[in-house]
């Protein structure tokens, strides 16, 4: 929880500094919300780099193969017709630099020019601070501001979704927006093309759940939720149909099994919640849910299952997981279909 508060604080401070025109010198941009990250990179560029002078004042380089000597040389270049320069370095894993390069980076941070803004962007590489490298960790903690772009809060995301749909000539209410988030995930990067697709398909002014279900491309978790809901109702045909859709998308059977197991664990905890008098808020806290929508769906599905069924289902998943990881030549797709049949028969 403390980590989340620190990450949120860094993000909010960055936004405030950007708005006030008091941007710092060195930033580390990380987190899975790439849409938001790219948006703010453009905003920083607008703030610091005058149009027409990008060639002199803005440099975006790949981190792979970049030396700290080259980076230092870029930071020392004076701005032209501007107060500051902007350098964006993508996927330079700072904690995997060799000792000499770490030393040069520390020296650069200790005497960093005020007229330069340097942003290390972690896109495909995950940012993992490593306290083993004490001097580098201390230098980055002191001189660089970490800005973590995470999925937005429920209310902020619903408002953003509504604005995007208004741009397509449609409205969407909060409950329908929650269904979209559940179906397509909560990352803006993934939602943008889905909103455009749904906006082009919808006939009425108001977007409906049916519009979303008709054309949206659901994320793996959403499909598996529908699959487990089908087996709790004993509907093997529907569960098998959904499994077939995932396999056509080239999803790995071991990955599908992992998500099925996770969903059944969530269903088990929902059953425990019902049996012990706990509510959706307990489930939301347990599974770190940003919205009560999936919690309500879980409780609804749990009412159709028993404690014994949940325990037996998890045992079947664990057994198949061990077999998939240890047996050679196993028909993984066939075993998944058999698992769904067993789950549906016991429901």
Show which residues each predicted segment covers.
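Conserved beta/loop motifs at nucleotide-recognition and modification sites
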Residues: 1-347
